[in-house]
Amino acid sequence: MSKFYKFITISVLFYSILMCYINVASAKTWQCSFKDGWTLNQDGTETSLSKGTFYGTREYLPPDRMLPLQTHGPMETQILEEMVYQPVATTLIGHAVVEIGSMTLSVSETLTDKESIITVIFHDGVTKALVERNLCIRIE
């Protein structure tokens, strides 16, 4: 009897993990709007990002990419195209090191059904870090 219960437990866990992965991979499109954020300068000065009405739309392309459908501009498009994403349960976690002109950025994102949290570390320049929170919904 003990082996039977172990088999059932392992089967249920495997099925649960598989369903979480399929859930993220099958629901592919998100629309996100800016909620809040801030930057940190070299001297430690924190500056709030001004709230806009802009929203962006992106589509997850398994196994690890994001297709920007609507963005704020070419810089955001390039960042999204270079990010590599990994599904973890119902969340997508992305990262990239991006070179834009003379800037080198380390970018990370955690994307869920409800929000996106993006962090950017700047290699050079006056601005050293940026954190941005966005409200997101799955639209497909």
Model segments located where?
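Low-complexity, intrinsically disordered Gly/Pro/Thr-rich segments
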Residues: 113-124
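Contiguous, well-ordered beta-strand patches that form the walls/edges
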Residues: 64-106
